[in-house]
């Protein structure tokens, strides 16, 4: 199955109308270009192997390339052997699951959608995450060499960052639990740090 220039709209009667980011109650996917294999629909379950998928959402979020084995069902999204590339991020996902009891809970993605992910050799920009978690809009933080396992919703997440780099000199390896994200100022954090190196210039930039 191939598509080129397809538009898709998913609209509910009650819009969330966020000032920034994706409105899951009024989502418009534009110029979808895809190569799909083994595409099946079984009731509420959609399964396919994605060879290539590119699209943009009306919020401004753009996926330049997405590939992997995808399953969607009743508020759950599961990706295996996934790869996602945007202008600022390059994400390798051996596994990713987004689990909501139904699609309506995605309106409150930060608190209501459970995430389980394994990430390897990844570059990740907070500018991309901000489309789904608008409080991160002004962070402008890029993480590189990300190797991690995480679980939980954004607001109550735990995991193991085996490695992550940011700035010119900062490197971190840590097991963590974080509550209250993305509001860092009001959040609560527990960390078992295996390695931390940084510089005064990086600290000033992150402060």
Where are these regions (language model features)?
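N-terminal targeting/secretion presequences
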Residues: 1-207
């Amino acid at each position: 199955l191939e598509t080129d220039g397809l538009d898709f709209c998913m609209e509910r009667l009650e819009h969330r109308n966020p000032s920034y980011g994706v409105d899951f109650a009024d989502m418009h996917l534009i110029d979808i270009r895809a190569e799909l294999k083994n595409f099946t629909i079984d009731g509420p379950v959609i399964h396919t192997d994605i060879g290539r998928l590119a699209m943009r959402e009306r919020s401004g979020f753009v996926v330049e390339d997405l590939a992997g084995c995808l399953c969607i069902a009743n508020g759950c999204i599961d990706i295996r052997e996934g790869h996602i590339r945007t202008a600022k991020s390059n994400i390798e996902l051996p596994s990713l699951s987004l689990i909501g009891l139904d699609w309506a809970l995605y309106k409150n993605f930060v608190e209501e959608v459970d995430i389980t992910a394994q990430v390897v050799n990844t570059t990740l920009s907070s500018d991309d995450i901000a489309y789904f978690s608008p409080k991160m809009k002004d962070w402008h933080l890029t993480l590189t060499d990300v190797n991690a396992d995480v679980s939980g919703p954004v607001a109550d997440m735990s995991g193991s960052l085996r490695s992550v780099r940011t700035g010119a000199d900062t490197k971190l390896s840590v097991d963590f639990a974080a509550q209250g994200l993305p509001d860092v100022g009001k959040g609560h954090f527990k960390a078992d740090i295996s390695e931390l190196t940084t510089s005064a210039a990086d600290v000033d930039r992150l402060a």
